[in-house]
């Protein structure tokens, strides 16, 4: 069976970009069980409530839902277990220093496969205030209206 090439996205955390200002992003490997990998290959995962924390100088991803594999037996995994993230020591130190500052947190942004290996994109982020969220929504709506207007203008010309 040939190896997959490229990047196959399994799940994205769209809520994270809405609730946080993402400052830095990192790509991390994930320590997974076999049935978790098989479930991910089927495209099953949810990152909505996911977050990352440090335990014993290691970064762990929590509250990510990877459902049990359908054909799995007693070897199946727990759907919402804690999963270890694999990063270089220097990256871990840099992230932990940033998170120790007030208001910063680590959120998983995207779960994907690169050359057959499961990876997660994590972001060091600061929470948005309510008026920031409203302002972002307003800007997106204005951009949509401008795009719609440009399309209609181009259709009238053509």
Swiss-Prot record:
One of its GO terms (cellular component) is cytosol. Residues 133-158 are annotated as: Disordered. PROSITE patterns: SSRP. Its main location: cytoplasm. Gene3D superfamilies: 2.40.280.10. It comes from the Bacteria. Pfam families: SmpB (PF01668). One of its GO terms (molecular function) is RNA binding. Residues 133-152 have a biased composition (Basic and acidic residues). SUPFAM superfamilies: Small protein B (SmpB). Keywords: Cytoplasm, RNA-binding. GO terms for biological process: trans-translation. Coiled coil: none annotated. It is found in: Cytoplasm. Required for rescue of stalled ribosomes mediated by trans-translation. Binds to transfer-messenger RNA (tmRNA), required for stable association of tmRNA with ribosomes. tmRNA and SmpB together mimic tRNA shape, replacing the anticodon stem-loop with SmpB. tmRNA is encoded by the ssrA gene; the 2 termini fold to resemble tRNA(Ala) and it encodes a 'tag peptide', a short internal open reading frame. During trans-translation Ala-aminoacylated tmRNA acts like a tRNA, entering the A-site of stalled ribosomes, displacing the stalled mRNA. Belongs to the SmpB family. This is SsrA-binding protein.
